[in-house]
């Protein structure tokens, strides 16, 4: 097969699979990443803006300085918002909003921002956090593309669960083993985080943790391809100084290894300044199974397969992520995985409705609304179904209930929700 043909295939796959994603990762194991980047830059389908990361991009000021300099050579006005705000001592949400405003000036049409050679930069924790924040501020027409020989340490599994990101390995959509190929070994360890969080080794529940922190350290390390010690300390021990936090971290790590010593090698290894879960240990993780089901539901070509995938995702989501824990990093992830669960309920409701089973569709949507009462798109679908079933009084009652509930939460009824209600009542 010629390189041109391969380029056509990987480009077509990119267009197919990335259409609804904010972020695209060209997986490190792909052989034709550079071919695709060249094709994206040359394509007339959408405008692409390019920034090659370097060893200088170590923190937020350095990254923004380099990015605004290079992109201003492509679009002279780029960087005005960020430069006006400044790079240092600024809230990351404000800084990301300013960069997003600059990105929106690049093009009013769909466009790409390609961060190439991402592995060349020794990313500091502040830049890592900023990039995560930026994803939620990206303008609708701008898509972020990472090309790297190693996996950027973003929470890719959670991003995929929310439908914000996709991973591509050449022409293939990555649907499992998101971080590395699984070790060629039996699944001796099974990790369950959709619920209170527990670990099973060789069919037996592990209960020798010596506190909850070693167990949470394992769960935190599964979240990303790799983490720094400072990221761990910041997530777990914000009330301690650096030396105290490091000491407690090492004690916690030893307890984690002791609890799982029956597997042989240490489950958490240190490589090149980062900690990661040992790739020699094959772990069955319910979060991975859940996200795999979401991907299959999104990509399946027939309703039967879609239905089975959405149903599996719903069944896997027994309880919220690490239910009962209230650490900031946990509650943040909990909301993100809940987004995938609401999607599964809503999509299965759509299938039930298409199959002329509106009552079953309504029951699924009511479950979604109960799980997240603030998601107004679900409430709109419920009102549409009530109207379709000629349950006019319940349409009115539902709107009044959610209006009061949103008010009590300090939220407002969205104009689209109010407009739909008026249309349904007036019809």
Indicate residue ranges for each PLM-predicted region:
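Short boundary/linker motifs that mark transitions into or out of structured domains
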Residues: 1-7, 13-16, 161, 166-167, ...
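Sensor-1/coupling segment of RecA-like P-loop NTPase cores
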Residues: 22-23, 27-30, 120-126, 132-168
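P-loop NTPase Walker A phosphate-binding motif
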Residues: 23-52, 66-69
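Conserved NTP-binding/hydrolysis module of P-loop NTPases
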Residues: 60-81, 97-101
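Conserved P-loop NTPase "ATPase switch" module shared by AAA+ and STAND
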Residues: 99-127, 147, 337
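Intrinsically disordered, charged and Pro/Gly-enriched terminal/linker segments
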Residues: 155-158, 167, 222-224, 241-245, ...
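DNA-binding patch around the recognition helix
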Residues: 185-187, 192, 251-281, 404-418
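Short amphipathic alpha-helical recognition elements used for nucleic-acid or partner binding
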Residues: 204-236, 256, 379-382
């Amino acid at each position: 097969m010629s390189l041109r043909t391969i380029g056509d295939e990987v480009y077509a796959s990119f267009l197919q699979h990335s259409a609804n994603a904010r972020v695209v990762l060209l997986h490190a194991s792909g052989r034709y990443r550079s071919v695709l980047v060249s094709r994206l830059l040359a394509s007339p389908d959408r405008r692409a803006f390019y920034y090659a990361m370097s060893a200088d991009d170590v923190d937020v000021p350095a990254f923004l300085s380099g990015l605004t300099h290079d992109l201003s050579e492509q679009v002279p006005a780029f960087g005005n918002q960020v430069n006006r705000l400044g790079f240092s001592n600024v809230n990351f949400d404000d800084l990301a909003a300013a960069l997003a405003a600059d990105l929106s000036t690049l093009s009013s049409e769909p466009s790409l921002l390609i961060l190439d050679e991402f592995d060349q930069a020794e990313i500091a924790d502040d830049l890592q956090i900023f990039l995560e924040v930026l994803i939620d501020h990206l303008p609708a027409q701008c898509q972020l593309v990472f090309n790297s020989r190693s996996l950027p340490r973003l929470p890719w599994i959670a991003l995929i669960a929310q439908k914000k990101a996709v991973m591509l390995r050449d022409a293939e959509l990555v649907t499992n083993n998101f971080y590395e190929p699984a070790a060629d070994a039996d699944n001796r360890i099974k990790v369950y985080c959709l619920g209170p969080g527990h670990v099973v080794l060789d069919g037996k529940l592990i209960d020798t943790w010596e506190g909850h922190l070693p167990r949470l350290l394992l769960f935190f390390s599964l979240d990303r391809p790799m983490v720094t010690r400072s990221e761990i300390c910041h997530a777990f021990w914000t009330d301690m100084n650096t030396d105290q936090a490091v000491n407690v971290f090492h004690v916690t790590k030893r307890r984690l290894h002791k609890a799982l010593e029956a597997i042989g090698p240490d489950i958490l290894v240190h490589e090149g300044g980062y900690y990661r879960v040992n790739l020699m240990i094959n772990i069955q993780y319910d979060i991975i199974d859940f996200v795999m089901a979401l991907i299959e539901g999104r990509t399946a070509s027939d309703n039967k397969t879609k239905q089975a995938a959405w149903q599996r995702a719903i069944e896997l989501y027994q309880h919220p992520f690490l239910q009962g824990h209230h650490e900031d990093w946990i509650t943040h992830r909990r909301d993100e995985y809940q987004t995938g669960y609401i999607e599964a309920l809503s999509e299965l409701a759509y299938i039930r409705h298409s199959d002329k089973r509106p009552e079953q569709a309504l029951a699924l949507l009511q479950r979604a609304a109960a799980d997240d009462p603030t998601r107004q798109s679900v409430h709109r679908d419920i009102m549409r179904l009530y109207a379709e079933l000629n349950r006019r009084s319940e349409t009115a009652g539902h709107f009044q209930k959610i209006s009061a509930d949103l008010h009590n939460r300090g939220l407002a009824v969205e104009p689209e929700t109010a407009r739909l209600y008026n249309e349904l009542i007036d019809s």
